[in-house]
Every structure is written in C-alpha cells, then in structure tokens.
C-alpha cells in the first residue's frame, strides 16, 4: 500500500473537486495538496503574454477548501505560511492513515509565484 498525494491548483480543483466525495465514499486515504493563488494561473499567463495588461476572466472567488473537504466527511487544514506547511502535512498524513479518509491541505500562495525563481509576469514575457 502506498500513500497517494494529489497536487491541484485552485482552478483545477474547482472543476473536479466533487471527486473528493467519491474518495470519502470509498474511504480512500489520499492527500490533496491544493495550491490556491486565486486565479486560473496558466490562462492568465497566456493572456499576459498575448494581450499584455488585458487579462479577463481569470480571477477566482474561492471557498474555504478545508471546510469543503470537511463538508464531504474528510479532513482539511489551511496554511498561509511556508513554515506551517510541513507540520500540517504530517498531521493530515497521520489523520488519513488513522481514519482511512481523504484529507486536503489548502495552501494559500502568492499569485506571482509560479515556480522557484520565476514570477507569472516574467513567465508571460516573450523571450
């Protein structure tokens, strides 16, 4: 048996988040790490590159994803600081193993931080 970890962006999860209910139903102790930057980041990056300063329809009004997970019967936590990530992940990993239920770690991240050393603005620039 292996630990399954799912990494999803907020826009991605909003399109298929109801699958969390299926994971609860079948008691699948998966770990969902949800990265919330409040936007459809990839779409925004392409818009910035092709139509500078004319971004449209990429901002998201997100729910409390930890509460969303709990509403389905799973477990969830929200972190806002990097130093809180590892302890929260370990707590949720232990909880998933103990309860045989899915868990979700809702991570609020900087919308500009898309990858180490690169911002969404620099990634959108043509090189």
Tell what function each PLM region has:
Residues 1-127:
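Thiamine diphosphate
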């Amino acid at each position: 048996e292996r630990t399954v970890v799912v990494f999803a962006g907020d826009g991605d999860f909003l399109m298929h988040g109801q699958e969390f209910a299926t994971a609860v139903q079948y008691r699948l102790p998966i770990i969902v790490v949800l990265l919330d930057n409040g936007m459809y980041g990839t779409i925004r990056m392409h818009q910035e590159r092709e139509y500078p300063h004319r971004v449209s329809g990429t901002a998201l009004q997100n729910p409390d994803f930890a509460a969303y997970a709990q509403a389905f019967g799973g477990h969830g936590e929200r972190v806002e600081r990097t130093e809180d990530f590892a302890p929260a992940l370990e707590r949720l990993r232990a909880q998933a193993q103990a309860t045989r239920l899915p868990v979700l770690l809702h991570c609020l991240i900087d919308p500009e931080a898309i990858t180490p050393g690169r911002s969404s603005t620099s990634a959108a620039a043509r090189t």
